[in-house]
């Protein structure tokens, strides 16, 4: 990808985001909060309207919004100058994230990158919402909390860029927004200037408590070893003598080690998975900044606006990252309750208005989403006695935040705020240990998703709120004690740096995300050819009940799959029988074992049938018999090979012209 093109896209994005934030300052006093509220607000409004009237794939608004933003920037240049530190924090987070995305841009089948990319692709079509499910033909994409993906797609549509670049720029934008909001929270709570950079570093490159001990327990640990320490460390191949001893203390006789990941924000952003926890972190930082503003002198109109936005974060969390709703409610609802007990009633009407308006804007989505089977896979349950975190492992992971919690009890200047936050985070930590979300996983992974989604959010919340409060405290014990909690964890920056330097960067700068599969020039040309053809249901081989390379060719061609990853669709749709039936029938089709392949293709409205290198088994013995059975209605597009013992290409359905 041309650096000129990338630079123009980033410049257009920054100008429009700055203009949007300045426009929002008419109602919201704080610069950082105004930008976040403006972004969320415009996305919510679009999300609502497009359920009735679609904007199209490329709404022609970029010239107008850019000119309007430049005018607002000139008119409010004094405001921009006054808020340069906040702007610098946004650009710091954006640029740091871009160093990872630019070096490692592939959107492959690791983690959930491909399905997250698929949501962006389907929203970029610009049709009436809900859009079609790209991984389950004939069904709408209304079974997942995908507001973050809608926002990324809306950005890409306005900027007239592709889904791959939209994926990466939206990722960097959310990291920049998180950094900006976190910086605002620190600035309000901590007058000690170094505190800002310590908290920012702790969030962007700092690790959890394990990183300090990991180098004594594991030979040459990598970041993955440290974030997957609970469970992984017990069975690690490269344990030191001390590591073997600790492993023995943590192991439970007769129990397989539980896999309890604790991926801090610093690690999460390096993976490149545009997953809903990103939005969860932004909502955390937004709530923290709003609470800090309310506690440090916001009054009148600004206080009412802050209360409105704070309440609105709850319904927004439900459609962005439903996993953190209970904890967002604890944080936000806890502050409202605290204010009420102190005799502050000014928040009541604005908070009700904010919650009602945000919910109303989400209503068209919610009436479908709340009826989907994904909710049947979730139930909060008590953690069984044998499924608790080993005490030693828990302490090795959480000792920094436990220390920060205890040190916050020494805070005297803002004692009410400190006690409220201590209670909130202590309850959150206890809840994450004694309760879990019972989903599709079991055995050693019974708490996997719960700890993966909850711990990282709680850890970041403690560091951001109480860490800032402690570093700004007049108590030297609280201030320097918190430094002792945070500084050792910054050693994670070394491990991240070692990983960044050591990993191959052969696809650097290919921000379409498809470089990994387009290394094969034939596949690259097939994707280019398919992308230019009309929409239609597409099938390709290689699906199993796990993450697979399939259906990457279909996805990067912008086409809809008859079936994507079957395990994921089954999860979203509650074990929908049709998913397993489609998987079995597709495997039969590619094995040339389907009784009537032509009838099956026509019945499922399949327009494109891909034949890829992996289909050329047994000297391509299945190709000619299959071609003979479907050629009456499907035209073969030859891409490579001799169409006998080796073939790469695809069939396209021949649609007969209507009779005159």
Regions found by a protein language model. Name each.
Residues 103-104, 209-259, 350-551, 565-569, ...:
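Transmembrane helical bundles and short interhelical boundary loops of multi-pass, membrane-embedded
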């Amino acid at each position: 990808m041309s650096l000129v093109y990338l630079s123009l896209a980033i410049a257009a994005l920054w100008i429009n985001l700055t203009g949007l934030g300045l426009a929002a300052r008419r109602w919201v006093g704080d610069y950082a909060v105004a930008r976040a509220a403006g972004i969320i607000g415009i996305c919510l409004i679009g999300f609502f309207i497009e359920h009735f009237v679609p904007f199209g794939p490329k709404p022609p608004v970029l010239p107008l919004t850019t000119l309007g933003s430049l005018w607002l920037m000139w008119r409010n240049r004094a405001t921009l100058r006054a808020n340069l530190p906040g702007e610098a924090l946004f650009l710091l987070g954006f640029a740091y994230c871009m160093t990872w995305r630019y070096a490692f841009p592939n959107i492959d089948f690791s983690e959930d990158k491909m399905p997250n990319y698929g949501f962006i692709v389907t929203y970029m079509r610009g049709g009436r919402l809900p859009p079609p499910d790209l991984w389950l033909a004939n069904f709408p994409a209304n079974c997942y909390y995908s507001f973050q993906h809608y926002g990324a797609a809306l950005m890409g549509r306005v900027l007239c860029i592709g889904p791959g670049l939209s994926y990466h720029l939206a990722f960097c934008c959310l990291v920049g927004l998180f950094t900006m909001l976190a910086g605002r929270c620190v600035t309000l709570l901590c007058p000690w200037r170094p505190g800002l950079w310590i908290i920012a570093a702790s969030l962007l490159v700092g690790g959890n408590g394990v990183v300090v001990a990991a180098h004594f327990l594991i030979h040459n640990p990598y970041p993955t070893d440290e974030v997957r320490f609970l469970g992984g460390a017990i069975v690690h191949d490269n344990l030191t003598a001390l590591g073997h001893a600790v492993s023995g203390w943590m192991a439970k006789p007769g129990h397989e080690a539980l896999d309890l990941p604790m991926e801090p924000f610093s690690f999460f952003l390096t993976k490149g998975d545009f997953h809903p926890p990103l939005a969860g972190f932004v909502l955390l930082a937004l709530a923290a900044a709003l609470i800090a503003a309310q506690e440090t002198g916001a009054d009148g109109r600004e206080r009412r606006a802050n209360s409105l936005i704070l309440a609105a974060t709850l319904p927004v969390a439900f459609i962005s990252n439903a996993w953190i709703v209970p904890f967002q409610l604890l944080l936000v609802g806890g502050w409202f309750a605290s204010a009420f007990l102190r005799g502050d009633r000014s928040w009541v009407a604005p908070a009700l208005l904010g919650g009602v308006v945000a919910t109303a804007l989400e209503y068209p989505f919610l009436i479908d989403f709340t009826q989907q089977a994904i909710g049947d896979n979730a139930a909060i349950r008590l953690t069984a006695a044998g499924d608790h975190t080993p005490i030693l492992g828990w302490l090795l992971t959480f000792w920094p935040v436990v220390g920060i919690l205890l040190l916050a009890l020494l805070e005297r200047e803002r004692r009410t705020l400190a006690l409220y936050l201590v209670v909130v985070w202590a309850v959150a930590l206890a809840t994450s240990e004694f309760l879990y979300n019972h989903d599709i996983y079991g055995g050693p992974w019974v708490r996997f998703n719960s700890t993966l989604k909850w711990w990282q959010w709680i850890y970041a919340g403690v560091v951001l709120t109480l860490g800032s409060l402690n570093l700004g405290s007049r108590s030297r014990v609280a201030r320097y004690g918190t430094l002792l909690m945070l500084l050792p964890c910054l050693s994670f920056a070394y491990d991240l740096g070692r990983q960044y330097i050591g990993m191959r960067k052969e696809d650097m700068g290919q921000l379409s995300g498809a470089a990994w599969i387009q290394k094969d020039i034939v596949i690259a040309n097939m994707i280019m050819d398919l992308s230019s053809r009309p929409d239609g249901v597409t099938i390709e081989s290689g699906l199993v009940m796990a993450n697979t390379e399939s259906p990457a060719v279909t996805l990067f061609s912008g086409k809809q799959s008859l079936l994507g990853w079957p395990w994921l669709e089954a999860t979203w749709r509650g074990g929908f029988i049709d998913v397993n039936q489609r998987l079995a029938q597709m495997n039969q089709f590619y094995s040339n074992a389907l009784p009537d392949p032509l009838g099956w293709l026509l019945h499922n409205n399949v327009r494109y049938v891909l034949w890829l290198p992996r289909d050329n088994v047994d000297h391509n013995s299945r190709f000619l018999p299959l071609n003979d059975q479907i050629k009456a209605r499907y035209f073969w597009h030859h891409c490579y090979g001799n169409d006998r013992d080796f073939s790469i290409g695809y069939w396209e359905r021949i649609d007969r012209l209507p009779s005159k």
